[in-house]
Amino acid sequence: MLLLVDCSSCRTPLHLPPGATRIRCAICHAFTLIAPEPRLQSHASASPFPFPNSSPAPSTFIYPPPTPSPYTHAPHAPSPFNHAPPDSYPFTHAPPASSPFNHAPPGPPPPVHGQKRAVIVGVSYKNTKDELKGCINDANCMKFMLMKRFQFPESCILMLTEEEADPMRWPTKNNITMAMHWLVLSCKPGDSLVFHFSGHGNNQMDDNGDEVDGFDETLLPVDHRTSGVIVDDEINATIVRPLPYGVKLHAIVDACHSGTVMDLPYLCRMDRLGNYEWEDHRPKTGMWKGTSGGEVFSFTGCDDDQTSADTPQLSGSAWTGAMTYAFIQAIERGHGMTYGSLLNAMRSTVHEIFDKNKGRELVEVGGADFLSTLLGLLILGASPPDEEEEVNQAPQKTQEPQLSANEAFAVYEKPFSL
């Protein structure tokens, strides 16, 4: 049975490897000592679903609902960086400076009571056949926008990329899971939360009957080949269902097959004219996929049966995810007044670049240039071909960014804000 222990410092639930005598928290970096195995087994054997009414010692908590964080760290000192926009950031009218975010000095963990909090995940799968070129740029651009446009404190943004110096902040399955727990930890009315993921996505057969189309959507961490994928059911249970009244969460997921990756009850179907209707995705089993009173809005790269592009075509030089670039571009151009205007602008941008290239464009894979489909070759969620493999694919369906939510609403009336 999978065991979870609470961090002795910040109470973030941690996956406990079998036989471990101590574990390091990916969020606050504190070490938690583990009691001898018989004591752990005695707690685990009491019930397959332990509850808070059993009170193990702080160092041996078997995951109950998290308690408020005891952080006493002072907030970050002002950053020495000038926060120039990343190279791939939309609408940089002067020669952009290189990103200051890749090797920022480590600091104390983000406080859990900030009014604005974000987890940003960019997975490049470097030096593997799954490698993507735009995901680190996506992460840096998203961080820059949240800080400059929406006043997210840098100290309240948790970055997970392979470029982080600390391996505890690499985008592994365990670290991403812990970061999601941290994101919603002790949130309170008025909090605004953001979860951004740029990387590979996929789908697999649904095993519990909660999917309308019969498939679960998944996100692929950097270690997915050894640790497995993150399934939409897990994401929903971790950052959607616990969300209390007055808390708002925005998920921006740039990955293949990501349309309903948050497992939310309603999906907004919009055509090219901007007309829309809400599609009911509530499970026929009656399983609850909504929140505990909070609001969740999810912008995703494409529909569940589509793929998302990793391409230099939108920025003109730097590689980015098409959806992330279109999302930031729409906001920078003033189209983010309402959820409907933002979604419509994003879709128009992606449609425009696809129509312009008629599904075909010169792209680069592993150092070799050749013609293939813009949205069918370097796509998030598909494995790039070997360098010597000849590619001759038919054009894919146009990528169409999606919006889903925990409740249906008037998308052209509700103001968008992070």
Swiss-Prot record:
Its EC number is 3.4.22.-. GO terms for biological process: defense response; negative regulation of programmed cell death; proteolysis. The active site is at 200, 256. Residues 70-80 have a biased composition (Low complexity). Residues 68-113, 385-406 are annotated as: Disordered. Residues 393-405 have a biased composition (Polar residues). InterPro entries: Metacaspase (IPR050452), Pept_C14_caspase (IPR011600), Znf_LSD1 (IPR005735). It is an enzyme of class 3 (hydrolase). Transmembrane segments: none annotated. This is Metacaspase-2. Keywords: Hydrolase, Plant defense, Protease, Thiol protease. Residues 103-112 have a biased composition (Pro residues). Acts as a negative regulator of oxidative stress cell death and hypersensitive cell death response mediated by immune response. Acts via indirect or direct regulation of AMC1 at postranscriptional level. GO terms for molecular function: cysteine-type endopeptidase activity. Signal peptide: none annotated. Disruption phenotype: No visible phenotype under normal growth conditions, but enhancement of hypersensitive cell death response upon infection with avirulent pathogen. The gene is AMC2. It comes from the Eukaryota. It comes from Arabidopsis thaliana (Mouse-ear cress). Changing residue 256 to A: No effect on the cell death inhibitory function. The keyword Cytoplasm does not apply. Belongs to the peptidase C14B family.
